[in-house]
Amino acid sequence: MPAYREKSPAAPSDCDADTTSQKSTSPQRVDDPLASTNVQTTTEPVWIKPGSAAFRRISIALFLAGYATFSLIYCVQPLLPELARHFAVGPAESSLALSLTTGFLAFAILLAGAVSEATGRKKLMLVSMCVASILNLIAPLLSDWHAFLVVRALEGLMLGGVPAVAMAYLAEEIDPKALGMAMGIYISGTAIGGLSGRVVIGFLTDLFGWHIALGSMGALGLVAALGFAVLLPASRNFVRRPGFQIRYHLRAWAGHLTHAGLPFVFLIGAFAMGCFVTIFNYVGFRLSDAPYGLSQSQIGLIFVVY
C-alpha cells in the first residue's frame, strides 16, 4: 500500500495543515481576541434575495425602525415655542430639547456598532427603540425643565443604537446586488419619520395639547418596535464577538480621522446639518408671534419642505 495512505488523520503533514486552516474547519484559537465562544466555521454567506418574503419583511421592519427613530428625535422641534412658554425658558434654552438629543445620538452611533457585535444586531436595535419610546412617554409627565432635558438626552443616547446597526445588518444579510434598494427603503423611513413626527405632532398639539401629543409619539414608537420585533428575521451571517474590543475600534476611528479626505467630509456634513436644524429650530418662534400668529398645526406644515 502506498505510504501516503498509512498516514494518521490525527497527524497531518504541514501541507495538509495549511489546507485545513484555509478551509477553517477547525476551531479558532482560544487566545484569539475575536474568537467566538462557540466553534465557528467559515461558510459562504446566505444572502437574502430581492423579491423574497424575507426581503419584504426586512424592508418593512427597517422602514419602521427608521420611521420611529427620526419621528422620536424631531417631534419636539415644532413644540419648542410651546416648551419655552410652559417651562418659562428662552428660545436658545428650549432648543436644547432637540440639540441634546441629536448630540447624544451622534456620540452613541460611534459606539453602537461595536456594542452590537457583542450583543447582536436585532437585539440592540429593538432595545434602543423600546427604551427611547418609553422615555418619550415619560417626558411630558415631567414638570422640571432640567429633568425633561435629561430624558431627552437619554433618548438620543438610546436611539443611537439604530442607524449604524441597521446599515450593518443590511450589509450582512442582503444580496449585494439589492443592498442599495434595501438601504434606500430604510432611509426613506427615516425621512418620512422625521417629516411626519414634525407635522403630526403639530395637529395633535392643537387638538389635545403638547403633553398628549408628545406622549402619543412615544406610543407610536412602541407600536413600531413591536412590528420590528415580529418582522425582522434573525441574522444569518452575523458572527458574535464576545466583549468590547476597544483597541480594535480605536484603531478604526483613528484611521478615519487621519484619512486625507474623510475629516473634511465629516465637517461639511456637520455644518450643513447644523445649519439646517438650527433654522427649523427658531422659525417656529417667529411664525407663532405677530404678525403671523400661526397655530401649531400650521407651523408643523412648514416642515413639509423637509
Task: Outline where the language-model segments fall.
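Juxtamembrane intracellular "pre-TM" segments in multi-pass secondary transporters
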Residues: 43-52, 233-266
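Interfacial helix-cap and linker-helix signal at transmembrane-aqueous boundaries
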Residues: 83-84, 115-116, 200-208, 288
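Conserved MFS/SLC helix-loop-helix module at the cytosolic interface between two early adjacent transmembrane helices
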Residues: 107-145
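Residue-level signature of mid-helix packing/kink "hotspots" within the transmembrane helices
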Residues: 74, 102-110, 194-195, 306
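Short hydrophobic/alpha-helical segments at membrane-entry points of transmembrane helices
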Residues: 144-152, 265
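Cytoplasmic helix-loop-helix junction between adjacent transmembrane helices
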Residues: 151-190
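Helix-loop-helix hairpin linking two adjacent transmembrane segments in secondary transporters
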Residues: 147, 176, 185-232
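Extracytoplasmic
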Residues: 57-91, 112, 279-285
